[in-house]
UniProtKB/Swiss-Prot annotation:
E.C. number: 1.1.1.-
Membrane-spanning intervals of the chain: none
Positions of region (Disordered): 1-24
Entries under Gene3D superfamilies matching the protein: 2.20.70.10, NAD(P)-binding Rossmann-like Domain (3.40.50.720)
WW domain mapped to chain residues: 16-49, 57-90
InterPro entries the UniProt entry points to: NAD(P)-bd_dom_sf, SDR_fam, WW_dom, WW_dom_sf, WWOX_SDR_c-like
Protein's UniProt name: WW domain-containing oxidoreductase
Modified residues (Phosphoserine): 14
Gene: WWOX
Similarity remark: Belongs to the short-chain dehydrogenases/reductases (SDR) family.
Locus of motif Nuclear localization signal: 50-55
Subunit annotation: Interacts with TP53, p73/TP73 and MAPK8. Interacts with MAPT/TAU, RUNX2 and HYAL2. Forms a ternary complex with TP53 and MDM2. Interacts with ERBB4, LITAF and WBP1. Interacts with DVL1, DVL2 and DVL3. May interact with FAM189B and SCOTIN. Interacts with TNK2. Interacts with TMEM207. Interacts (via WW domain) with VOPP1.
This protein's GO CC annotations: cytoplasm; Golgi apparatus; lysosome; mitochondrion; nucleus
C-alpha cells in the first residue's frame, strides 16, 4: 500500500503472523485486538503468541483517525487521499506487559529514519542538510520533508540536487523542499549560501552537516587547503559560524555533524601533544587519502563538542554521529579499489534509510532536547576516542579554523 510505504511501513507479514481468518485491529485508544472471522469473535491476546499489544506513538504525519456509524475505527491518509481500517501504526506495536520491564533501547542499527519520525509533525520547522542530493543526506532530507518540514538541500551539484528535489516531490507533491548551491571546497560559496539563506528570512531549527568527500587524490582547493580537510571540516565550520545567529534566534535548535567511527584510528596532534596543521592539510608527499578522511572525521567530533560548549547556553545543541559501516554510496567513487570494496561489502551494510536514522534521531528525538556534546552510533550514545574528547585540542582546532578563514577572506569573512 502506498500509504503504508509513506508511513515507513511495508505491506508485508510481521514475525508474529496471524492465522488464516484472523484480522488485527485497534481501538480508538490505541489498544490492539484480534478478530476471528471464522468464529465471529474478538480477543485481546494474539492467537499465536498470547501477547497483548498497543500501538506506539501518534499517527504518521498527514493521517487522521475517525469512527464510522458502526463504531469501528478507520484512518484517513490525507496525503495519498485514501481511507483504510488498517491502523498505520500496527508495525510499531509494543507489548503490554508492565510486569516485565525491558532495558532494550528504543532504536538500533536496523531502525530507519522514517520509523524514528513516525507520528511526528514538523510543519513550521526549517531543516538544512548539506550533501543532500544522494545517500544518507538525501534520505535525511526526504524523511523530514515527508513529515512537514521546510527542507533545504545544500549541494554543490545543482543538477543532481534538482533531481533529488523532484524525487521527493514525486513521493509527496506538497513537500516543501528546495535546493540551494553550496560548495564546501570554496569559502566564498559557503558565504554566498549563508547570504542566500538569510535573505529568505526564515528560522533554522536543524542544520545537518552531512556532506563529505572520501578517497580523493591529493589536491588543493582554490583557498589553498587540502580538499578533504576543507570539505569535511572547515567548510562546515564556516557555515555554522555564518548561521549561528539564525540558529540562536531559532532556539531550541540543533546541529548534527556526521562523523565516522574511523575518527578512532588517527590523531591530529604531534609527538608533543600540540595540534599539527601539517596533519590536517598535508603536502602531496605526506598525503594518504584514508588518513586524511580519518583526520577530518576526528575534526568533526572535536568541532561538534566545542560548538555545543559555546552555543548550548543560547539554546543551540550539537551532536556528532556515525551513520553506519561501509554503506554503499557515491562517497567511494574516487578510486576503483574503494568501489570494489564497497561492492563486496554491500550485502552486509545498512540501507541508506537505516544510515540516516542516527542523524534523524539526534535531530528530532524529544528526549535529546537541550542535550549535546555527545557522539552517537546506531541511535545510541557511545564514547568517542580519547583524542576526540580533548577540550584543549577542540579549542585549538576552533582557533585554527577561525584563523584559516580570516587569512583567506580577511575582513569579508563575516
Amino acid at each position: 500500500m502506498a500509504a503504508l510505504r509513506y508511513a515507513g511501513l511495508d505491506d508485508t507479514d510481521s514475525e508474529d503472523e496471524l492465522p488464516p481468518g484472523w484480522e488485527e485491529r485497534t481501538t480508538k485508544d490505541g489498544w490492539v485486538y484480534y478478530a476471528n472471522h471464522t468464529e465471529e469473535k474478538t480477543q485481546w491476546e494474539h492467537p499465536k503468541t498470547g501477547k497483548r499489544k498497543r500501538v506506539a506513538g501518534d499517527l504518521p504525519y498527514g493521517w487522521e483517525q475517525g469512527t464510522d456509524e458502526n463504531g469501528q475505527v478507520f484512518f484517513v491518509d490525507h496525503i495519498n487521499k485514501r481511507t483504510t481500517y488498517l491502523d498505520p501504526r500496527l508495525a510499531f506495536t509494543v507489548d503490554d506487559n508492565p510486569t516485565k520491564p525491558t532495558t532494550r533501547q528504543r532504536y538500533d542499527g536496523s531502525t530507519t529514519a522514517l520509523e524514528i519520525l513516525q507520528g511526528r509533525d514538523f510543519t513550521g520547522k526549517v531543516v538544512v542538510v548539506t550533501g543532500a542530493n544522494s545517500g544518507i543526506g538525501f534520505e535525511t532530507a526526504k524523511s523530514f520533508a515527508l513529515h512537514g518540514a521546510h527542507v533545504i538541500l545544500a549541494c554543490r551539484n545543482m543538477a543532481r540536487a534538482s533531481e533529488a528535489v523532484s524525487r521527493i516531490l514525486e513521493e509527496w507533491h506538497k513537500a516543501k523542499v528546495e535546493a540551494v548551491t553550496l560548495d564546501l571546497a570554496l569559502l566564498r560559496s559557503v558565504q554566498h549560501f549563508a547570504e542566500a539563506f538569510k535573505a529568505k528570512n526564515v528560522p533554522l531549527h536543524v542544520l545537518v552537516c552531512n556532506a563529505a568527500t572520501f578517497a580523493l587524490p591529493w589536491s588543493l582547493t582554490k583557498d589553498g587547503l587540502e580538499t578533504t580537510f576543507q570539505v569535511n571540516h572547515l567548510g562546515h565550520f564556516y557555515l555554522v559560524q555564518l548561521l549561528q545567529d539564525v540558529l540562536c534566534r531559532s532556539a531550541p535548535a540543533r546541529v548534527i555533524v556526521v562523523s565516522s567511527e574511523s575518527h578512532r584510528f588517527t590523531d591530529i596532534n604531534d609527538s608533543l601533544g600540540k595540534l599539527d596543521f601539517s596533519r590536517l592539510s598535508p603536502t602531496k608527499n605526506d598525503y594518504w587519502a584514508m588518513l586524511a578522511y580519518n583526520r577530518s572525521k576526528l575534526c568533526n567530533v572535536l568541532f561538534s563538542n566545542e560548538l555545543h560548549r559555546r552555543l548550548s547556553p543560547r539554546g543551540v545543541t550539537s551532536n556528532a554521529v556515525h551513520p553506519g559501516n561501509m554503506m554503499y554510496s557515491n562517497i567511494h567513487r574516487s578510486w576503483w579499489v574503494y568501489t570494489l570494496l564497497f561492492t563486496l561489502a554491500r550485502p552486509f551494510t545498512k540501507s541508506m534509510q537505516q544510515g540516516a536514522a542516527t542523524t534523524v534521531y539526534c535531530a528530532a528525538a524529544p528526549e535529546l532536547e537541550g542535550l549535546g556534546g555527545m557522539y552517537f552510533n546506531n541511535c545510541c550514545r557511545c564514547m568517542p576516542s580519547p583524542e576526540a574528547q580533548s577540550e584543549e585540542t577542540a579549542r585549538t582546532l576552533w582557533a585554527l579554523s577561525e584563523r584559516l578563514i580570516q587569512e583567506r577572506l580577511g575582513s569579508q569573512s563575516g
